[in-house]
Amino acid sequence: MAHAEEPEDRMAWIEPEVRPGSLLVSSTDLTEPAFRRTVIYMIEHNDAGSLGVIVNRPSETAVQNVLPQWSPLTAHPSALYIGGPVKRDSALCLGIARNGARIDGVAGLRRVDGKVVMVDLDSDPEVIAPLVEGIRIFAGYSGWTLGQLDSELEREDWMVISSLPSDVLTPPRVDVWARVLRRQPLPVAMLASHPIEVERN
């Protein structure tokens, strides 16, 4: 099920601290393959640690092949995304609530921030379908122990930026990393033109 993207010119600003719903956008100096040019949507950030999923790493595995009951609700492409290096044999699901949908108290849904919800993949898709515009399923997640993410932020590995709901379901033809940076004021917006392969320039 396709999700209508929000206007790209809507601003989502750099945030002073991490919270559920924040984006972690990798810096141009972060060259570790697992996180290079990644955008992570943060689901939890508390005294127990931090957890999020990479929203711009589609795999070649179709949702139909692993969780066929959820395939009709999955935004294009109907592929499993790589949420991060932790517990790659497990799955997490984010969805975008429909305008006006009353999701609080609905079994199988938990609000993360605004219209973005966590979907329990053990719940009934027929119950969830009328309430969401689309979902994205992630294999694994990105996790940090208490204080670990703070250290990475101090090293300036990540920029903390507020999200738009459309960031979660953006199709792979869109460079999410560059698009999020273009929404920022100068000079941060200029980073969006950073070459993908520096060694080629």
UniProtKB/Swiss-Prot annotation:
It comes from the Bacteria. InterPro entries: AlgH-like (IPR003774). Coiled coil: none annotated. GO terms for cellular component: cytosol. Belongs to the UPF0301 (AlgH) family. NCBIfam families: PRK00228.2-1 (NF001269), PRK00228.2-4 (NF001272). This is UPF0301 protein RER_60040. It comes from Rhodococcus erythropolis (strain PR4 / NBRC 100887).
